[in-house]
Amino acid sequence: MKPMTSGGIVERQTSLAYLNPQFMESDAGRPMRILSEYLAPLQALQEAHIHDTVVFFGSARIGETGPLKQYYEDARDLAGKVTRWAQSISRHHCRLVVCSGGGGGIMEAANRGAVEAGGRSVGFNIGLPFEQRPNAYLEQDLTFEFHYFFMRKLWFAHLARAIVIFPGGFGTLDELFEILTLKQTRKLGRPICIVLYGSSYWREIVNFEALARHGVISAADLGLFHHADDPDTALQILKDNVHVDVRAPSPDLARSSTPCCQE
């Protein structure tokens, strides 16, 4: 029986659209889901005064044990060094904050190194049916769970002043080529330093020289990135290429730009 008011009028049960899970999880609600993955991190990062980041990419499968364990220790060490360097630049603004994909392996090592150095760190996690779970070294208010890979990658690029890319698989390669494309096409509104960590690995996995030799990239594109094989070398590359003026804090977000075509 339908509920009736005292006047005999039927009372209808209604819900606000944004509180309706059936709508929010539907195809029609997709634009709202995408927008929420932009606005929610934006608000949290601004409230935490996170100005810019140094992003660590790398495999979730590289842990403290196993044949590639040295990369875990190096990522942990480098993240600590980056954090102490950032603290020496400014203790009043959150500059060059270590950021990772929020999962295990190299991502965990980066967040761990930052925490052990007494700094903050950011985790942009992705919901997957396997492998990816937030690591234990993340701060709750700086940990973000994404449904969409492209929104997660947008946030990596938005704040990054530098990206250090450790050995990894499909996900790491996806992130590497995305950021190389953004830098090559000058779509980022500010300079970004890219460091490939582990030169023997990267030279075996990706033959950049062959790409240039075949003419599908220019020889100048080989200068889009640096190689490093130890934390001290990687840190020095960052110091030489990332310039932070604490008197003029960086904008909260790196703006995308489309270079003007000139004849």
Question: What do these predicted ranges mean?
Answer:
Residues 115-116, 178-183, 210-213, 242-243:
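Short, solvent-exposed amphipathic alpha-helical segments in soluble enzyme
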Residues 100-166, 170-173, 177, 202:
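Phosphate/pyrophosphate-binding betaalpha-module
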